[in-house]
A protein has these predicted regions:
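Membrane-proximal N-terminal amphipathic helix
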Residues: 38-71
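Carbohydrate-recognition beta-sandwich/jelly-roll modules
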Residues: 97, 106, 119, 145, ...
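GGW-centered surface loops in extracellular recognition modules
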Residues: 75-157, 161-164, 315
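C-terminal, surface-exposed recognition/capping segments
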Residues: 321-324, 345, 349-406, 410-421, ...
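Short aromatic-cysteine micro-motif
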Residues: 143-151, 189-447
Length: 572
């Protein structure tokens, strides 16, 4: 077999030159070759038309595939080891769904259903003698026990948006996004009923996203300066719950008021393998360096926990842009959008905390060892459990669908105060589903309350911070720097940094707030911008933050481990 070698390029160039020379010798003028109607110009035009035709054909094929799958969004990109699932409310269990989505069995991103696509991974050896292979080949409707699940992810399809109301304001219950889903990895709008068939980039809008024109959300783009991944994506998979450790037990069975092992209390477990599950304590007390490491180790799957094929996917810690991609979809007609400031609508807080409290050298208050539980909801939207409180021994009552806990307040002089009781609801209950981004079981949980979540975003100028120095060496697709030289926590310095990043969009910061030092974000969420000694972003609030926790909450931290800092994993 004859192989073409490196000199092929030279041969082709020589051939083109030869043809041009022959044409000139034959009396064909340069103008006839290069003019508007010249041979070369027409050849370029034909090449472009062929390329455009091929792109259109590709888009048409994707649309046909969507129609075949009853889908108005990009078909979820299933990776090896992923099992599509649906919820059986009668049996309170996840079941294998039809991956061809017949009858919208798996997902339906309509404004009525708000049924976002969910997948699970399972253990290699599961309960009842089953294996991972059994579930991967199981028929539609096969139940998957929660104990067998190692991760749960939710599909966020590629979309475009503009800020319909509340742009750069402190919009309390009135901020809203208009959303249009896109075809494949293109900027073509699936439903162009509003007269715009192609979404734009902000370079065409003077950086504004409130002009009534749909803009491609940067989380799905190759623009790493705005939180893209270096590739154009048809969508991303987002952890359904805050991350946890593989060894953490369901319902905190190994935790009581007498527990002193901090690896158990903080959900660190063996400090190795990540899971994404409901009804376990989230993994806290972990630095940003280690978050990035354990998140990326998921795709390697060295412990055979997930069934992934490392060569076909990437897993990493979440960035602001990806948080924004979830938040914007949630704050639209496709998600759990608050209509008014009524105390009922919107995403309810996960205010669960078992409040293991110990004596402190600081006589002001006692030290709290917060113990969370993923996917829970309080009894009201803005519910909170005081950070300075402890569980009354023996008061925790697991009622199946809910958990009731009585606490004792800790006074400022470290003496005990009054008792109070909170009720928390499982993620699948009526109240529990209010804590989801869709207000049903198919959304994403723990984005309001639970634990603050570290993002892979930071002030790039804070090179004296060890973690910033480390992150500066990481590939751009895994992290995004923010500008700003403000060094202190003063309003002036925070504002300086906030203003320096007004060109960023899609990250649920500038577009969804009018300030950075208080409660200036949408829905009166926290808004405190990073500064030199606290250069990293954290999002969402924690169990004790009440009304200021939420989708649009952002705060600063130094990257170190704390007992109320967790993280979330993204897969693409």
């Amino acid at each position: 077999m004859i192989k073409m070698k490196e000199n092929n390029g030279i041969t082709l160039i020589a051939l083109v030159i030869t043809i041009v020379v022959l044409l000139i010798l034959a009396g064909v003028s340069i103008a006839m070759l290069t003019g508007n109607n010249g041979i070369l110009t027409q050849a370029k035009k034909a090449k472009q038309e062929t390329s455009d035709s091929a792109q259109k054909e590709k888009e048409d094929l994707i649309k046909l595939e969507m129609i075949a799958n009853n889908s108005n969004v990009n078909i979820p990109n299933l990776k090896e080891g992923m099992i599509p699932v649906k919820w059986n409310a009668t049996n309170k269990t996840w079941e294998v769904a039809d991956k061809s989505n017949t009858g919208n069995d798996w997902y339906d991103y309509s404004t009525e259903s708000k049924k976002w696509a969910n997948v699970v991974t399972v253990k290699e050896n599961c309960s009842n003698g089953k294996t991972r292979a059994d579930y991967l080949s199981a028929g539609v409707g096969t139940p998957i026990p929660e104990d067998d699940i190692t991760t749960m992810f939710v599909w966020i399809p590629r979309y475009s948006y503009y800020v319909k109301s509340g742009y750069h304001e402190n919009a309390n219950g009135t901020g809203e996004f208009a959303i249009k889903f896109l075809i494949g990895t293109s900027d073509k709008i699936i439903d162009s009923s509003e007269g715009q068939d192609t979404a734009i980039r902000t370079s065409n809008t003077n950086g504004k996203t409130n002009g009534g024109k749909y803009v491609v959300h940067p989380a799905f783009t190759a623009d790493t300066d705005l939180g893209g991944t270096g590739d154009e994506l048809s969508g991303i998979w987002v952890g359904k719950f805050e991350s946890s450790n593989y060894t953490s037990e369901y319902n905190n069975k190994n935790i009581s008021t007498s527990t002193t092992d901090e690896d158990i209390l903080y959900g660190c477990g063996d400090n190795k393998n990540v899971t994404i599950r409901p009804n376990v304590t989230s993994w806290r007390y972990i630095t940003v360096d280690d978050i990035l490491k354990v998140s990326q180790n998921i795709s390697k799957d060295e412990a055979k926990i997930y069934g992934f094929k490392s060569s076909e996917l990437t897993t990493t810690m979440m960035q602001n842009s990806q948080w924004g991609a979830v938040a914007y979809l949630a704050q639209s007609e496709y998600g759990n959008m608050p209509k008014i400031d009524d105390g009922e609508s919107g995403i309810w807080n996960n205010s669960y905390n078992e409040g293991i409290t110990f004596g402190s050298n600081n006589s002001y208050r006692m030290d709290n060892r917060s113990v969370t539980l993923t996917g829970m909801s309080g009894s009201s939207r803005d519910s909170a459990t005081s950070y300075y409180s402890k569980v009354v021994d023996g008061s925790k009552k697991d009622n199946g669908d809910s958990i009731e806990i009585t606490y004792t307040n800790i006074n400022e002089n470290a003496t005990t105060g009054d008792n109070y009781t909170n009720i928390f609801y499982r993620y699948y209950t009526e109240n529990g589903q209010k804590a989801s981004t869709t207000r049903n079981i198919y959304g994403i949980y723990d984005m309001s309350g639970g634990s603050w979540e570290y993002m892979a975003n930071y002030l790039g100028s804070s090179i004296e911070n060890t973690f910033v120095s480390n992150f500066l060496k990481i590939e751009p697709k895994y992290q995004t720097q923010y500008a700003g030289t403000g060094a202190t926590s003063s309003t002036e310095d925070r504002t300086l940094n906030y203003e320096a990043n007004k060109g960023k969009y899609g990250d649920a910061i500038w577009e969804t707030s009018n300030g950075c030092n208080g409660q200036c974000a949408w829905n009166v969420d926290y808004s405190n911008f990073p500064y030199a000694s606290n250069p990293f972003f954290i999002r969402g609030g924690n169990y004790s933050d009440g009304s200021v926790a939420g989708l649009f909450s952002f705060y600063s931290n130094n990257g170190w481990s704390y007992n109320y800092r967790s993280f979330r994993v993204v897969l693409f």
